[in-house]
Amino acid sequence: MFDRAICTVFHTVHYENPLNVVVTVPWLGDKVLLCKRNIEPRKEKWTLPAGFMELGESTSQGAARETSEEAGAQFIMEDLFTVMSVPRVGQVHLYYRARLTSDQFDPGHETMDARLFSEQDIPWEDLALRTVKETLLHYFADRREGRRVTHAFDIE
């Protein structure tokens, strides 16, 4: 079940670890900010600002960096919202709430559009990733019920 690559000469383990994907759920009032992807995979699909964590940064710093790069948004980082293991692709997705301080955006080259959506206006069928959809469903359900909790689950 847990086969690892072990060097028979030096008796060391070659670790293959999952990648961390860091994301924000930028919100303003009853709306969330979505970015329309300008790169593959899933070009022209909508997503939350996201990307791979880089060496030397914390998960929240990485999520903040991605939000600045992809959306050009002004925001205040908040708390961890969802943690999802996606073993099929060797990733862990960490989503943070981020309160927007402006409704003006300056998307970077990876984003063709960035705009605010209310729950009923989200292009649910055009979302890039299942993890984004699951997070948004939790976000709006929690908002309706006045909850502020952290969710953790696996995506198969």
Task: State where each predicted segment sits.
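Acidic, metal-coordinating catalytic segment for phosphate/diphosphate chemistry
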Residues: 1-24
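A generic structural signal for short beta-strands and their flanking turns/coil linkers
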Residues: 3, 20-22, 42-44, 73-76, ...
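Well-ordered beta-strand scaffold positions
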Residues: 12, 30-31, 73, 120
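Conserved Nudix-box catalytic region and its N-terminal flanking loop in Nudix hydrolases
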Residues: 27-69
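A generic fold-level signal
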Residues: 19, 27, 41, 88-91, ...
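Conserved hydrophobic "DFG−1" position in protein kinase catalytic cores
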Residues: 26-27, 34, 98, 116
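Beta-strand-connecting loop/turn residues
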Residues: 3, 30-31, 103
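Unchanged
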Residues: 53-138, 142, 147, 155-156
